């Protein structure tokens, strides 16, 4: 187990480029199961969750060629399907939530899948019902083997149909799409997630020979095809990392440029920071965040307290609420954060309160932050990271604090952020990785 030692109070300045999007990578890498031809994917982030998924694919026989650090070629022409039943595979799947994205491709191409109940962040209940209901609509049968804690899913031949999803689940939509592209007939998915990650997934599948229309909307139409072929695909910059860097620049920056962010795919993210008073300038495909000596939280027209809430795309991603909350601790004014999609992602605020932040945790979904307006710096502290997004938020808090902090369980940060301490140290941070 490793920790970060952070010497806070050092201004960050310079240029930083976001990694490839973690959530997109997990999806598009799994599409390679759908064809026996090579699929090349570039801008793959070198992070724990993605690397673990690639290892899982290798275990079932996917041939993986690493052309360079962020460039891979995958070929699934000799898969070892019997390995899916092994205890070793079940154990490996149980620690990685991204493994759930193997369900759809395996079911679509081979008509069966046996996958462990996946792991991931401990951020409350994260249902798989949407995935299973979608597969059931397509004609699959599934059984939960409680003794081994695995899901056994089978279908002789999936058949297209109309389905209305009960929630716009991103991974659920992705899984259903990957199952449906090889199904017989036409599948219509209403209330589909439409995040840029889903759009990218659909574009890759179409390049592989799928017939998907309605991309970027919540109504997708998929005409099943007999076979998919190889293709090439480049992963988008990670919008969550872009938002994290905006937060760092607001709290600790003396002028930071975030390069090649794909502005058109950021949606409401820059405006969410602007509502906290943070200056975010768009310059070409870059974002520039100047030094923020003060930033003032907006209020609604009727004068009531500003509320920031997560919502399905094109709403605000829940993955950035933790970062926005930390930024608000040094703003002028008050803001209510409403975390609707997960019921325990706000529980990390007790660590910020220990650092001197003024936060009222109303319930598991809501917290009110009263900003210090940079008049009272956060205190350093010792803390343990509960999940990826809380981890990066606490790292930002520690960098802005006066003094030295220690953050444990940084493997959570490594799951989603590539070489984070090295990249931030190049901007002027003082972060050291140590073994516990």
Can you say where each PLM-predicted feature lies in the sequence?
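Short, structured segments at the rim of ligand-binding sites
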Residues: 1-436
């Amino acid at each position: 187990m490793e920790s970060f030692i952070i010497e806070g109070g050092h201004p960050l300045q310079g240029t930083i480029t976001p990694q490839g999007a973690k959530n997109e990578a997990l999806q598009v890498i799994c599409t390679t199961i759908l064809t026996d031809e090579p699929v090349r994917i570039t801008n793959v982030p070198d992070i724990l969750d993605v690397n673990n998924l690639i290892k899982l694919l290798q275990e079932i026989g996917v041939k993986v060629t690493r052309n360079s650090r962020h460039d891979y070629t995958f070929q699934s022409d000799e898969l070892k399907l019997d390995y899916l039943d092994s205890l070793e595979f079940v154990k490996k799947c149980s620690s990685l939530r991204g493994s759930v994205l193997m369900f759809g491709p395996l079911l679509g191409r081979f008509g069966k899948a046996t996958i462990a109940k996946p792991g991931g962040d401990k951020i409350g209940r994260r249902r798989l019902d949407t995935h299973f209901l979608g597969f059931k609509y397509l004609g699959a049968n599934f059984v939960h083997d409680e003794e081994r804690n695995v899901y056994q899913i089978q279908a002789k031949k999936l058949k297209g149909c109309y389905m209305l999803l009960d929630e716009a689940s991103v991974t659920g939509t992705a899984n259903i799409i990957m199952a449906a592209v090889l199904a017989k007939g036409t599948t219509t998915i209403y209330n589909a997630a439409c995040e840029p990650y889903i759009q990218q997934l659909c574009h890759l599948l179409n390049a592989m020979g799928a017939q998907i229309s309605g991309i970027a909307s919540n109504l997708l139409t998929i005409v099943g095809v007999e076979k998919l072929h190889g293709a090439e695909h480049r992963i988008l910059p990670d919008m969550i990392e872009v938002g994290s860097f905006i937060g760092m620049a607001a709290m600790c920056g003396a002028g930071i440029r975030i390069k090649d962010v794909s502005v058109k795919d950021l949606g409401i993210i820059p405006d969410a920071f602007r509502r906290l008073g943070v200056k975010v300038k768009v310059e070409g495909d870059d974002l520039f965040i100047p030094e923020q000596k003060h930033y003032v939280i907006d209020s609604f027209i009727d004068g009531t307290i500003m509320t920031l809430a997560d919502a399905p795309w094109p709403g605000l991603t829940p993955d950035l609420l933790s970062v926005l909350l930390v930024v608000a601790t040094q703003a002028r004014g008050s803001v209510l954060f409403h975390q609707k999609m997960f019921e325990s992602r706000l529980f990390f605020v007790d660590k910020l309160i220990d650092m001197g932040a003024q936060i009222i945790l109303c319930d598991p979904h809501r917290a009110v932050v009263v900003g210090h307006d940079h008049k009272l710096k956060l205190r350093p502290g010792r803390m343990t990271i509960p999940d990826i997004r809380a981890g990066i938020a606490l790292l930002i808090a520690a960098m802005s604090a006066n003094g030295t902090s220690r953050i444990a369980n940084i493997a959570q940060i490594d799951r989603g952020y590539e070489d984070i301490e090295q990249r931030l140290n190049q901007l002027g941070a003082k972060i050291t990785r140590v073994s516990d």
